Amino acid sequence: MARIAGVDIPRNKRVEIALTYIYGIGKPTSQKILKEAGINFDTRVKDLTEEEINKIREIIKDIKVEGDLRKEVRLSVKRLMDIKCYRGLRHKMNLPVRGQSSKTNARTVKGPKKPIRK
């Protein structure tokens, strides 16, 4: 297994798909990385040379991935909660943040129904 950005990349998958195992890299980003490195999308990870893997590592160093990205997201949500804006309050109450209605739906976020006690 090749190790890129602290993540073990599966050997038998195509490079384009294997790079998406890294948090913060989706299919479009992986395609940009491979285009910049000059590697074919259909190449398997096991067929990559050490030089190609190093090229990919160098390109990924410039992108915010894994721990840094998780930390940034966590801090931005915490900032919203600290300034007590609407989005921050919705995060704090575990409700939908992006304007979805929560009168009848939003069961996934709210959790299971609570029984009505008389």
Curated annotation (Swiss-Prot):
Signal peptide annotation: none
Entry keywords, A to Z: Ribonucleoprotein, Ribosomal protein, RNA-binding, rRNA-binding, tRNA-binding
GO biological process, one term: translation
Region (Disordered): 94-118
Domain of life from the UniProt record: Bacteria
Disulfide bridges in this chain: none
GO molecular function: rRNA binding; structural constituent of ribosome; tRNA binding
GO CC annotation, single: cytosol
Quaternary data: Part of the 30S ribosomal subunit. Forms a loose heterodimer with protein S19. Forms two bridges to the 50S subunit in the 70S ribosome.
Role according to the record: Located at the top of the head of the 30S subunit, it contacts several helices of the 16S rRNA. In the 70S ribosome it contacts the 23S rRNA (bridge B1a) and protein L5 of the 50S subunit (bridge B1b), connecting the 2 subunits; these bridges are implicated in subunit movement. Contacts the tRNAs in the A and P-sites.
Family, as annotated: Belongs to the universal ribosomal protein uS13 family.
UniProt name for this protein: Small ribosomal subunit protein uS13
Gene: rpsM
